[in-house]
Amino acid sequence: MSKRKEFDEDAPVDPSDLLEFINLGAGNEVGRSCHVIQYKGKTVMLDAGVHPAYTGLSALPFFDEFDLSTVDVLLISHFHLDHVASLPYVMQKTNFRGRVFMTHPTKAVCKWLLSDYVKVSNVGMEDQLYDEKDLLAAFDRIEAVDYHSTIEVEGIKFTPYHAGHVLGACMYFVEMAGVNILFTGDYSREEDRHLHVAEVPPKRPDVLITESTYGTASHQPRLEKEARLLNIIHSTIRNGGRVLMPVFALGRAQELLLILDEYWNNHLDLRSVPIYYASSLARKCMAIFQTYVNMMNDNIRKIFAERNPFIFRFVKSLRNLEKFDDIGPSVILASPGMLQNGVSRTLLERWAPDPRNTLLLTGYSVEGTMAKQITNEPIEIVSLSGQKIPRRMAVEELSFAAHVDYLQNSEFIDLVNADHIILVHGEQTNMGRLKSALASKFHNRKVDVKVYTPRNCVPLYLPFKGERLVRALGKVAVHKPKEGDIMSGILIQKDANYKLMSAEDLRDFSDLTTTVLTQKQVIPFFSSMELANFHLKQMFGYVKQSKTKAGQPQYTVMDAITLTLIQEHKLALEWVGNIMNDTIADSVITILLGIESSPASVKLTSHKCNHLHSHLDKPPKVSKEEDRIKKLMMFLDNQFGESMTKTEKGVEIKFEKYEASIDFSTMKVECSNEALRSRVVHVLSRAINTILPFSEASQNDVSEDDFENEESDDDKIFEQQTKIEDDVKNENKTEPVEEQKSEEKNEQPNLKKEELS
């Protein structure tokens, strides 16, 4: 029989068994997404975007750090610029010779989107990454694929699945030489008005490459989010203001337009307020959305059966900003979403000084962009011409970015169940928080799940053995395993052959024999064995006691680790070497080496010093009673503050017209008002209850003989506390003040140690 061989971390790794992953972009950042996977001589590139905060060559991924001629397949997840805008540069300006794939909607939108990117790029000809000619040449080589269809290229298989981010967005399930990899791209697990949620592939991947855009943040539920969005817009309009919503030309803008169009339809008072979509590109691409309705969810299909939902009833296209009649309230969705330039930046500079207006940020804001800067609500902003403009308009953030939050990401990671998780597409802080959260979550799992956050241009190596045939022999092969059964034994490799057998069969089926390794370690030890026994019991619960042939005490921890005092100040530990015993031994050694510095050890072994030290300065003598009174005063002062006054016998507490007095010699409370008296009695008893255990414990001797005492210190302290609290309450039972005064002269303080014991 045979079984797939799993990777052994302790085994030597052949370089050919290492999967290499490298970020050329989007490593500890958001922008210029580009990732490369190499394994068994095959290379896959995932996405090729630009960084929205930079221009020209500086916006590109670090293509110079990798030989692009080795790339077999380039897979594009969706049409956003930070994932696709450098694709024509790769295909036309480098030595890339591989094949490029994306879904049909992505290819249709990309043609218009990248053409617009070339036109509006705010750079000179010398810094332009590519021109229209390069774009057309590149698109002739791009191949479109359908969801759920498996394509094989040069031994590499990949299947696209719905990602739920924008129309056409997909995640890729890639198979390379027996290793399964899932790349999510940007994805969403929250169903909206027109897109499918991200799918969970039917096969389990070995490696998951997932976004970390929002780290450990949590999104509002969709309905609450929509309600807040509409409330902000409606409130701004009622105040006579304008609403600016910077958006990407395509993607989430269509979702927002669907929400606004429906809201305007249900509110007659808003129909006179115009909604504008300021993007000529979006107008051109709207036909694509109308074409690919069959790739959207059931909600939009039902509406489409009656009318085309993307032919909006209350949304107008703003063709020319110069002809825009900017009078009265309005709502404008304008690109670009990062406010770096274009219509959205022009309107921001125009509307920023008016406090009635609102800037509504609905997407993720990348570091280094105006969208990110204005979230800090600065007093002024700098215009594209360099002028300072006062910022009085309100700034609101509400994420409709269709990225997963922590709960959605964590749930998806659990469903996918990969052993290796690589986080990309996230700022360093968010990515670090997500890694820590996942590491804590996976801490107690039986299978070790590893989480990685590689930086740009820093390769990550993951060891994977390819598929191997393993022969099960001897006792291991007696019972035929069923699907899902786990087989255990010793795996023997000789040349390219693998055999699985039990330890008893090694002599029969191999040239190997077995032996037991006994570990022994000697450590310095300056405490007593009784003290060691005490601390080990605290940790492990049960410690077996015995003696050596020489009569030396010997302890056995967890039936695995044996401790013997071999000579003065030297303690020997012995155990049979294995993972569990080694771990227990490490814990035992740590405890033993820390005994001398343990506060418990100091308390248990401390004794009174009964002789004089004439060479030392004598501290001022403070009686035990004075020390108690001092601590008691501190406690009462914290409770009653300025209401308390010190007297000869104790203290006096005044509250409005009532007075209560405490006599420290008897601990009696006198007061004509029962409510105040009860309060003071309660506080006094709590004070004594708090102070006594520590002051008494610090004065008492504790010998090593106490270790075996069945009555714990906690029990003694509890008895003392109970007795004192009862004494105070009994002494302070309600009695006539005259009778109490007559008895005070003969009473002794009831806090003396002799009475307690």
Swiss-Prot record:
UniProt binding sites for Zn(2+) 2: D82, H83, D186, H425
Biased composition range(s): Basic and acidic residues: 715-757
Location of the region described as Disordered in the Swiss-Prot/TrEMBL record: 698-757
UniProt-annotated location(s): Cytoplasm; Nucleus
CDD domains reported in the protein's UniProt record: CPSF3-like_MBL-fold
A Pfam family this chain is assigned to: Beta-Casp
InterPro entries assigned: Beta_Casp, CPSF73-100_C, MBL, Metallo-B-lactamas, RibonucZ/Hydroxyglut_hydro, RMMBL
Entry binding sites for Zn(2+) 1: H78, H80, H165, D186
Family: Belongs to the metallo-beta-lactamase superfamily. RNA-metabolizing metallo-beta-lactamase-like family. CPSF2/YSH1 subfamily.
Function of the protein: Component of the cleavage factor I (CF I) involved in pre-mRNA 3'-end processing.
Protein name: Endoribonuclease ysh1
Lineage start: Eukaryota, Fungi, Dikarya, Ascomycota, Taphrinomycotina
Record gene name: ysh1
